[in-house]
Swiss-Prot record:
Record's catalysed reaction(s): a quinone + NADH + 5 H(+)(in) = a quinol + NAD(+) + 4 H(+)(out)
Protein name (Swiss-Prot/TrEMBL): NADH-quinone oxidoreductase subunit K
Gene3D superfamilies according to UniProt: 1.10.287.3510
Organism whose genome encodes this protein: Rhodopseudomonas palustris (strain HaA2)
Topology versus the membrane: Multi-pass membrane protein
Transmembrane segments: 6-26, 30-50, 63-83
Length: 102
C-alpha cells in the first residue's frame, strides 16, 4: 500500500464518520440513529485496517475485531432499549423520549 492509498482510505474513513455523525444528530428516530452510529463506527474501523496495512502490522485487524465486537454489543443493547421504550412511550422518537419523567 502506498502513501496515496493510505490518504485515500483515511479520507474515506473520515467521510464515513462524518456521515454517521450527521445521521445521529439529524435523525429523530432511535432506529435510524443506531444505524447512523454503526456507519460512524465503521469509519475508525476502516482507518485502523488501512493504517495496519500501510505499516504491515496485524494490530489494525485486531482493532477491527474489537470495534466490530463493541458495535455488535451496542446494537444489542440499543435494540433492547428501543423495544422497551416503544412499549412504554408508544414511539421511538427521541423528542418524545426526552420528555418522559421517572
Amino acid at each position: 500500500m502506498t502513501g496515496s492509498d493510505l490518504i485515500g482510505m483515511m479520507i474515506l474513513a473520515a467521510g464515513l464518520f462524518a456521515i454517521g455523525l450527521f445521521g445521529v444528530l439529524a435523525r429523530r428516530g432511535i432506529l435510524f440513529q443506531l444505524v447512523a452510529l454503526e456507519v460512524a463506527l465503521s469509519g475508525p474501523a476502516l482507518a485502523f485496517v488501512a493504517a495496519g496495512a500501510y505499516h504491515a502490522d496485524p494490530q489494525g485487524q485486531g482493532m477491527l475485531i474489537l470495534v466490530l465486537t463493541l458495535a455488535a454489543a451496542e446494537v444489542a443493547v440499543g435494540l433492547a432499549l428501543l423495544l422497551r421504550i416503544r412499549r412504554t412511550a408508544g414511539s421511538d422518537d427521541s423528542d418524545v423520549i426526552s420528555g418522559m419523567k421517572g
